[in-house]
Amino acid sequence: MNRFFVDRPVFAAVISIVLVLAGLICIRILPVAQYPELTPPQVVVSATYPGASAETVAQTVAAPLEQQINGVENMLYMQSSSLGSGTMQLTVTFALGTDPDQATINVNNRVQRATSSLPQEVQRLGVTVDKRFTTILGMVAMFATTDRYDRTYVGNYALLNVVDDLKRLPGVGDVQLLGNIDYSMRVWLRPDKLAQYNLTPSDVSAAIQEQNAQFAAGRFGDQPDPHAGPFTYTATTQGRLPDAAAFENIILRSSSQNAATLRLKDVARVELGTESYLVDSNLNGTPAVPIAIYLQPGANALNTMELIQNRMNELKASFPAGIDYAIPFDTTKFIKVSIEEVVHTFIEAIILVVLVVFIFLQNWRATLIPVIAVPISIIGTFAGMYVLGFSINLLTLFGLVLAIGIVVDDAIVVLENVERIMTTEKLSPRKAAIKAMGEVTGPVIAIVLVLCAVFIPVAFMGGLVGEMYKQFAVTIAISVTLSGLVALTLTPALCALILKPGHHEPILPFRIFNRAFERVTSGYTRGVRFFLKRATIGLIIFAGLLGSTYYLFERVPGSLLPDEDQGFLFGVAVLPPAASLERTTVVLDQVSENIRKNPAVDNVFAVSGFDLLSGGLKTSAGTMFIMLKDWKERTTPDADARNLPRTIMGMNAGIKDGMVLAFNPPPIMGLSTTGGFELYVQDRTGGGVESLTQATKLITEAAAKRPELQGVRTTFDPNVPQYDIQLDREKAKAMGVPINSVFTAMQATFGSLYVNDFTLYGRNYQVNLQSEAEFRRDPGDLKHVFVRADSGSMIPLDALVTVKRIVGPDQLERFNAFNAAKVTGNPAPGYTSGDAIKAMQEVAAQVLPQGYQIAWTGSAYQEVSTSGTGSQAMIFGLIMVFLILAAQYERWSLPLAVITAVPFAIFGALLATDLRGLTNDVYFQIGLVTLIGLAAKNAILIVEFAVLERESGKSAIEAAASAARLRFRPIVMTSLAFILGVVPLAVSTGAGSASRHSIGTGVIGGMLAATFIATFFIPMFYSLIARKPPKKHEDETADTPETPGGTGGGI
């Protein structure tokens, strides 16, 4: 085998060409995204109970649904939100990896069990079950450029002509028009006119149901008919009414005596309006309709957004004059720029690696070999990624950047050995290649096995962190495997073809470098011999290093992922409870105008009536999507998205009618609402709103005193002004008034009463009753609303009910079937999410009363549930390295000499991270896993050659010293190539730089320690372990000696 590929260079070349072709083909078809699917699947159950209070919705709608859904397969947690507008949304979150379609089916089956226990009105309107697409791709804004079209027309034009079209595009998961502005036939009742004609809202509702209905009229001449004619005719008749004019003419009462007819237009105003008037929105001050677009799981984000842009341009050609669109919110800009930055880093890494190799080899022919070999392994990796269903994302690209410095090792190990044999033994390139392969085949295979043993088992870890590990680790494992294949096939063939016998005197700069490196090598050798002779001192230093490593592990703060400048921010304006939508719109317009004055801001999309923090519709809150200018235009620290929130809140601090909050989005969109933490304070005692309020107040006030925390607040507000209406049921019964007629009249007057549907443009829309605005402004208007007693007399509502002003919540949330209050917050400057989580846990343990506890959600849930995962991955990697080496060496003790290199790498990584003020996040932990393999690789090169020297008859100390001196240059060369290949990650700027800094800093620090510190100690540990000569097997003969790794000196 040693000479097979040396003698067959075409065969070796064909293998590499196939790898490159497969990789190039797969690059074109692999999906591109910022991250793989890291957000847990969610299923949303929605229901509406028009006119009901938040408490009523929670008790009669949310609770029965939760009781049935609780415990559905693979469920992590569920959360419901019941609003004073009568809407309820229940979100069920499932474990990562759950099939969202199957989860939707399972939830829907549970919902069907609960349907019969829901209020009749809720059943009529229907309960919807949908899977939620958590990855928002962007937002399209449609607006009128003239006064000809109002927001209702623009929104419904978008619904009919844009939304459905975009939904059909490949890669689009869902398209939602925010604000629920579907057409609705609005019947605006005048209670004074109803009273004048002795009518009630129920009479109007019954008349509409009777006359706006679809009827089947049958067929003439249909079978069976023994005297059937030659034709069969279908009979048609007017069914649903087509427009507002037809609804106006609905007959409410008709008299045969005087031919008088009372029509709907006599007691109400009818118009084509919208289903809801709870939301208003504008783009940079211009009224606009927001259309949110969500990405389908596994789809190519960049291609999908390009399809959307192209399709919108095509649709624009048919827009009515005066209607236009913009795409102010586009998350793919960050994806595109951050991936471009990683690609630039990738190219810089290749250049630096080639430069290091050339400096050490000092021969352009020799340098050409790894230059050819490295791209083959990297490009071929894309084929492996495609087979495994991976995408081109930040994690896989990080893996490829680190892989550059790793895969070059195998080529250099072979090349350096061939050159050494050519120089010392004066052999031809072909013979040197054959002999070199006999010596390095074992180490190359061992390195590949060890690196794969580190990375592949990590891929089987579960959860969000496990998925991130898998993307990264498997990418490197594929590249390392292909690198080993190329090193054993193409590299020796290239050595035999490209290298030339005889070496000329190197040029002056190289001679200076060589002399300097020889002095370094001599100093290194003296240091190695010092520790070989004084092992006690070495062991004491090693023990101190272990203690320092433990201290740094405790000192470096933990977090899930670093905050990034993603090119946009979220803003929220919160007004006093019960503030009207008009007040909110005025404040939001003022805030938006202020924000647009900041030179770093590009667009502001403001949505009044939507509270991003609570996820519900509130007239007293508004949300802003703030798009920033390109990263190249924002080079100063104050223009960084991570620093802008403080600036934005400061410039709006003078607004007296509301509080303005701004925050950077979470690192992974869809995992949580904000970039901070989210939790729920659960009431497990059933104590009611007041008890929950007190418990929430205790925890927020205590959290405000902790230095690790800032901005801790609750979305739970129990002090929203309300009216409590009490019906005197005994009086109503005594007067012969049905109880249900009282509440139907109130709903149709002060709320919105859904009657039935009508058809327009091929779609079905709701018909809704509600009083004109002048009759529903305050409780005094109750005197204008009448109900009919059994005797036929008309009774005003104010004679049956009493009204009292109270305060209460307009939104009630439940978490895992318990009443709960949502609390959000952020780490204070200088602290991490891990610090904040720990502080909140301590606060909760100290102040929450018996029966109350906190439950994490979003990114905080993932961080808490994956705590310790990094340590598990590292320990698992160490165990696998040990077992692989034990199998290779056929000894349990010798692998310990290799394992001892790992603590040095961990120490260096932690020290570098601590000095730079970074955190122990997932990227850092991924880097640690990489360092285990790389540190072990360096140790393997020393131990392998020490084993060969030991078998040649040298003592353990001499074998260790000789191996250290012999392998120092290739170790330094490969390690420097790797380190310089990672430097662009650690010093990068722009989009996605925080994650690149996190992984680059730790890896560089670890490799520096593994290269320039651990190499002094590895020979010492080998000598301590190998002092006893290896035992000979009984069946070994003198003429067939075997190395521990088999033939050729393998490990």
UniProtKB/Swiss-Prot annotation:
Pfam family, one: ACR_tran
SUPFAM superfamilies linked: Multidrug efflux transporter AcrB pore domain, PN1, PN2, PC1 and PC2 subdomains (SSF82693), Multidrug efflux transporter AcrB TolC docking domain, DN and DC subdomains (SSF82714), Multidrug efflux transporter AcrB transmembrane domain (SSF82866)
Family to which this protein belongs: Belongs to the resistance-nodulation-cell division (RND) (TC 2.A.6) family.
Keywords, sorted A to Z: Antibiotic resistance, Cell inner membrane, Cell membrane, Membrane, Transmembrane, Transmembrane helix, Transport
Annotated GO MF terms: efflux transmembrane transporter activity; xenobiotic transmembrane transporter activity
Induction notes from the record: Repressed by BepR.
Null mutant phenotype: Shows increased sensitivity to deoxycholate, ethidium bromide and crystal violet.
UniProt topology in membrane: Multi-pass membrane protein
Localization annotation: Cell inner membrane
Predominant location category: membrane
Membrane-spanning ranges: 10-30, 341-361, 366-386, 387-407, 444-464, 478-498, 537-557, 867-887, 892-912, 928-948, 971-991, 1002-1022
GO cellular component terms, A-Z: plasma membrane
Classification of source organism: Bacteria, Pseudomonadati, Pseudomonadota, Alphaproteobacteria, Hyphomicrobiales
The protein's role, per its UniProt record: Involved in resistance to several unrelated toxic compounds, such as dyes, detergents and antibiotics.
Protein known as: Efflux pump membrane transporter BepE
GO biological process: response to antibiotic
Gene name linked to the record: bepE
Subunit comment: Probably part of a tripartite efflux pump, which is composed of an outer membrane efflux protein, an inner membrane protein and a protein that expands the periplasmic space. Could form a tripartite pump with BepC and BepD.
